[in-house]
Amino acid sequence: MITPGEYTLLLTDEVQRAIAANRGRDPLEVALDRNTPHARLVATQVKYLARAEAKLPSYAAAQCILPPLAFEQASSEACAAHKRIAGGAVLDLTCGLGADAFFLARRFRRVVTLERDQTLARIAAENFRRLGAANIEVVNTSAETYLAQPGLHFDWVYADPDRRSGDGRKLVRLEDCSPDILSLMPLIGRTSGRLCVKNSPLFDIGEALRLFPGARVEAVSLGDECKEVVIYADGTGPGITATALGRGSFTATPAQAGAPPHPGAFEPDRYRWLVVPDVALQKARLARLHLRGKADIWSENGYGFAAERPEGIIGRVFAIESIEPYDPRRLKRAFKGRGAELMKRDFPFAAEELARRLGVHAGNDVRLAFTKIGSGFWVVRLE
């Protein structure tokens, strides 16, 4: 975390010029450069501004101040921009670096965002100034203290609770995070009729619907990695959505999600296409429903198989060269020493263990997909 003294230094023209002059350099070289004032402080900013070019490009372009821990915990711009809420005024209970508040400010006329740490609150306010976000008010207080005030009214309350314990362990359960949203529900309920909560990508969709029965729950992925599970408790549900940013979304009710029948027996000779559902569909347990009528799939965590190339798929599609039972000895004879891309779903061995068993190394000579269907293990060679 940046100390109050370091924050004061970061505001000076001398340090700001040094940061600007050294962007693009190796941070280690900057830290050891005797000609750079406050070299270690400058090097840290150079390092995180470089990382922000991909994760938070607006922050990078404005040369915002980036505390390392707050940066690591911040939403990416792609995820922050996606939040499906809008209105007149929103209360953000968990400012942090402020990426979510910054993008909420584009959807709301007024944003009030809370930050318990005084220095981080000052940094967030300074960054909003640099970003030109004039409709955001940063309040240095806790969610518990602010919500205790009488007469509050907001169109939405937003929260991204801190999911790390005091000793650095990652937390998943909502009641273990800070602030404890569940214990604050009476105060939140009198402040707004709508609540949006960002959760860990490990958070269970079923648990979200149990805690908030009338909610919409969305699993969000970026680059085929599940980034967050978002609860929209506004009484418009229940509903489940899988969103792959840049690829598309698919929505169903909980009743629909549990409805798809399993295909019959696996007949490998029928199939010419392998479908890899996006991880958002897996997380939301909507893969089978999404592929219904387009591809056969036996498990929410498995692959889909199609005789004709399916269209409108949220995921990837590969042409199949062959499908055969998994026989590690035969595969080792065929591929030992070759470069291989190994994919797996619903398969008991990690990719590293498969590579060891088959005697292959990372490469693109061949692409193999491993899976389990029923009691059988299969390997799919892809074109």
Predicted feature residues:
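SAM-dependent transferase fold signal centered on methyltransferase-like domains
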Residues: 1-383
